[in-house]
Amino acid sequence: GGPEVSFHAEKILAQYTQLTGIMVGEGEETFTQLVRFYHAPKGQLQDIPGLVLPQGRTQPRELTDMSKLPFLYEDLGKFQNRIIYYESQRGCPFRCAYCLSAIDKSVRLRDIETVKKELQYFLDHKVSQVKFIDRTFNCNAAHALAIWRYLLENDNGVTNFHFEIAADLMTEEELEVLKQMRPGLIQLEIGVQSTNEQTLHAINRYMSLEHLRQVVDKIHSFHNIHQHLDLIAGLPY
């Protein structure tokens, strides 16, 4: 499974005839059903949604309800001295031409009270770093503010939280919360991709570079948050 095979599944199955099938789309439920099938075979592979088999595609898998996904870190001993990857939302509202996240036309949030409970678990265990893999963490300002305020109010003095954000979406309210953070509590990865307006237009990345610059400068002036800016090599123009 995965993006490398999901979009040319039939071609890959024809090329690699030793494969039984390919998982396409979101894999949590599909993989779970596959494990159960091979552990105690019942029914047929064709009954499992989200597969491409030599005989054809099974039923499409519905998008995952983020609030129903289990918490995977109850045994933190397995992850000692490792980065914890955490997802509080899935999808992205933008349509950037280079990004797979643009395919999912919805943003699905994990229940905020569940998120707070799970973040508190990390805080209680003083893990070194939690890296949010939300594609654009602050695309929903209320969701982002709720999490940032919770971390501000429950900081354990140790744990660092990493977020990927769109700086041009930042509000004054969000910036005011970030200004109060302990140095090292959070770090920000900011997607810029290109400073060429023609390039941004060609890849459907619509934003105000001037506003982005102002936000980055303002966060820099706080002297409490490490930020790094992403650029993509090889884009047009």
PLM feature spans:
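Radical SAM [4Fe-4S] cluster-binding motif and immediate context
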Residues: 70-225, 233-235
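Acidic/polar loop patches that form or flank catalytic/metal-binding clefts of enzymes
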Residues: 44-46, 160, 227
